[in-house]
């Protein structure tokens, strides 16, 4: 029986690397993607040069500015990042059909038995990295091991722009000296709790009696014990199709401006509707989410009389839900979101409503233009108002 080999591929500082590939003058500089530091927001990605100042993803932009005043702050272009991600996944799929994407910038590959095609799995990893660099002008790091969890940790040890292979049978020895914080699934709270018990390394964690660990971590304990010993039998698999589509945005300042909220709701509705149509689906449920300035969050949903995928139908339903909340609540809004769910195939209509048919034709035309020139290339009168309100 062939020895199992799993590869974890991770693009280094992905958002920043994309920006640097298009703007060479940014290379070797501290670069932060996330927006302007004076705006309310967080760091989405930081270059390795910026990380030397203690900057990390999720940090408030203003804090990052204080740590590194000379950093270059970039708004970011998520449409561009998705395009790069699609090319990245296509490159990986050329090497193995057993591909499990994990977000835009990383994926697992099942590569057991692929030695005969590439000489060795290490050579295969090198080919992948070289092709990514050649075609995307960004670097990738790769970890190789007998399981997903060990391969991912190996990737962390390989960064940046390197590769690390853990030989079969040496997983426990590889993991033993490493700090528990490197283990996927151990967050800050669990790390603090384990270290308060004197458990600082994965080797120490692997040797803790299961009964003792279960008292402190509950049902999560068996997984952690196995993972710390390099045991992880999870398969590499394509993710199931998402059961919902949603978009939300946090505002720079809390607002009660209804014109602004309606325009933003229209924009979010058009984005999720376009994604739904791209999948060839319709939705039966529309939901909105509102978070107020005091962080209280309310959600409301509506089951539609018939499934739809149109911009106008989704927006009008979401608008009624939003107004139903705001008409009776005068608090300022911090976050607004809209979602759709309960998908089905296109509905067969015995009688076609002319008005609905015209809207469907309009949506299809918008989709074609936006796919070619970008979502902002054409706007409705409602969303165009956002330009005057930002």
Curated annotation (Swiss-Prot):
Pfam families: IMS, IMS_C, IMS_HHH. It catalyses: DNA(n) + a 2'-deoxyribonucleoside 5'-triphosphate = DNA(n+1) + diphosphate. Disulfide bonds: none annotated. Mg(2+) binds at residues 10, 105. It comes from the Bacteria. It is found in: Cytoplasm. NCBIfam families: PRK02406.1. It is an enzyme of class 2 (transferase). CDD domains: PolY_Pol_IV_kappa. Its cofactor is Mg(2+). The active site is at 106. Poorly processive, error-prone DNA polymerase involved in untargeted mutagenesis. Copies undamaged DNA at stalled replication forks, which arise in vivo from mismatched or misaligned primer ends. These misaligned primers can be extended by PolIV. Exhibits no 3'-5' exonuclease (proofreading) activity. May be involved in translesional synthesis, in conjunction with the beta clamp from PolIII. Belongs to the DNA polymerase type-Y family. InterPro entries: DNA/RNA_pol_sf, DNA_pol_Y-fam_lit_finger_sf, DNA_pol_Y-fam_little_finger, DNA_polymerase-Y, DNApol_IV, PolY_HhH_motif, Rev_trsase/Diguanyl_cyclase, UmuC. The keyword S-adenosyl-L-methionine does not apply. Binds 2 magnesium ions per subunit. This is DNA polymerase IV. The record marks 15 as: Substrate discrimination. GO terms for cellular component: cytosol. The lineage of its organism: Bacteria, Bacillati, Chloroflexota, Dehalococcoidia, Dehalococcoidales. Keywords: Cytoplasm, DNA damage, DNA repair, DNA replication, DNA-binding, DNA-directed DNA polymerase, Magnesium, Metal-binding, Mutator protein, Nucleotidyltransferase, Transferase. One of its GO terms (biological process) is DNA-templated DNA replication. It comes from Dehalococcoides mccartyi (strain ATCC BAA-2266 / KCTC 15142 / 195) (Dehalococcoides ethenogenes (strain 195)). Residues 6-187 form the UmuC domain.
